[in-house]
Amino acid sequence: TAEANSKNLKLFYRSKFKVVDLDKFNIGKYDLIVSNPPYIPSRDIKNLSKDIINYEPLTALDGGVDGLDLIKKVIYKSNHLLKRMGMLALEVGHNQYRRALSILRYNGYRAISKECDYNRNVRCIISTKVSFFKFKK
């Protein structure tokens, strides 16, 4: 877990970890938000392996029609939670990098790095909030 990793890295004393429902997350001023929202398009759920479907609840998988519903929500909500120059680390699904990056930019973020999986697909975007913008639906 993130807490265990922070203890191993001797960062626990200066870190706070919260696992919350995005809708109940209060406005605050955070330095970093890490999110792994559901990002699988609804139409693709039926094609997932049984190992995934039997292990994960549907709410942890289904990202809506294009898989971006909760990604958009995290970006919008984090815009009100992060300090200026705060960082957002956001996991994205296969082939969602460009669309997620566009939404981030529109909402006042600048991407500073991307992390790829073993197949060289971008799976995580790390960005910095540089200004406040309205949410693009």
Spans of model-derived segments:
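Conserved SAM/SAH cofactor-binding pocket of Class I
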Residues: 1-47
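Residue-level signal for inorganic ion chemistry
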Residues: 2, 36, 52, 74, ...
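Helix-to-beta-strand junctions that scaffold the AdoMet/dcAdoMet cofactor pocket
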Residues: 11, 56, 81-84
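Alpha/beta-hydrolase-fold catalytic nucleophile elbow
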Residues: 36, 55, 91
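Mobile active-site "lid"/loop adjacent to the S-adenosyl-L-methionine
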Residues: 39-69
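Conserved Class I SAM-dependent methyltransferase catalytic core
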Residues: 65-129
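Flexible, glycine-/basic-rich loop-and-beta segments that form/coincide
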Residues: 128-137
